[in-house]
Amino acid sequence: MRKSFLSSTFVLALAMSGAAFAEDAPPVAEDAGATSPFEFAASGEKAARNAKPEEAGAKVIGGEVAADGAWPWQVALVVAGQPVSADTQFCGGSLVLDTWVLTAAHCIHMADDQGEWFDVDPKAISILVGTNKLDGTGDVVPVEKIIKHPSYSGTQFDYDIALIKLARAPTVPYKTIEVPDANFSQVLNQPGVTTIVTGWGLQNGGKLSPELRQAQIQMLDRNLCNTAMMEARADEAAKGFSYAAEVFALTEADAYALWDELVAKAPMPMSENMICSGTFEGGKTSCNGDSGGPLVVPLEDGTYIQAGIVSWGLTATSGHGCEETATFSAYTNIANFVPWLNEVIETNP
């Protein structure tokens, strides 16, 4: 079995054809064999698709149900020892090698009732492989080891990446998914590039999905996403700030100067370790239960590469489900972590 899943350096140009995702059949699972199918990465003629504005529509909330056998690298993290169902599935993941699953660190590093952070016991979870339905089909594989990024903290979402080592290879048909190197990532992360997110997360109305759902969105400029979030925060913060300015009798010029200073010091919600994907039209993003799952980019030759991991999105103001007016979600930028991923796999044979 190969120990490294780093793709070759790609010499790429964005394709401007805007081929429609809806016309392409999702990949169909077949016997994976003993080796991860990463050989396609050697081609220097790969190109990421550019999304047409009218294509950048659905999200997993309200997205369409994926066909049986589609997205054969998608796995579900489920509670061990319990019947598989939408209630026992809590996160997603992707097979990057025969016995290695890529997921989000926040899926396996949680807080207890007292607010103390802990790593989930590998024996407490299993990995469901080879099915798009949470109905008892597929192969439930035990977990041998869980390794989160050492810089991840439960109090924020930076470095939100983890690897899960399976106790054995799955016994059902599956495929693994390629991840990009840094050079390819620069191309994939261009605004307008088509992305596809899959998962069993919450749908409209807060209902859990028992079937894997797929949705097409697109890459958005991270700085624009940060600006949008900062403006939303500023609208709320400005209400209290204007009152404080009155109390302290600040002149208009002093108040504006102080406000600009505060805004300049505010940390950007999305770091360079994150990808922004969605649509500024709103209401099209991933949700709870999709966490840890893959954000993939379709390439012009019909193959796919995983650019991101579902990390976080905007919560509905009601506290239930996800924000229906949210325009985007944050995804872990996998390319930034390939050296760490390879190191973990090589040192944990």
Where do the PLM segments sit?
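C-terminal subregion of chymotrypsin/trypsin-like serine protease catalytic domains
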Residues: E23-A29, P37, V75, T88-L128, ...
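Extracytoplasmic
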Residues: A70-P72, V96-D98, P122-A124, V141, ...
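Chymotrypsin/trypsin-fold serine protease catalytic domain
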Residues: I161, A167, P173-G282
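Generic short beta-strand segments
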Residues: L77-A80, G199-G201, S311-W312
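Conserved beta-strand positions that form and line the central face of beta-propeller blades
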Residues: K145, T176, I275, S286, ...
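Protease-domain processing segments flanking chymotrypsin-fold serine proteases, especially trypsin-like
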Residues: R2-T9, A13-L14, G18-L102, H109-V120, ...
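Short loop segments at secondary-structure junctions
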Residues: A80-G81, L166-P170, R222-N223, L299-D301
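Conserved catalytic-core segment of clan PA serine endopeptidases
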Residues: A67, D119-V172, A182-S185, I196, ...
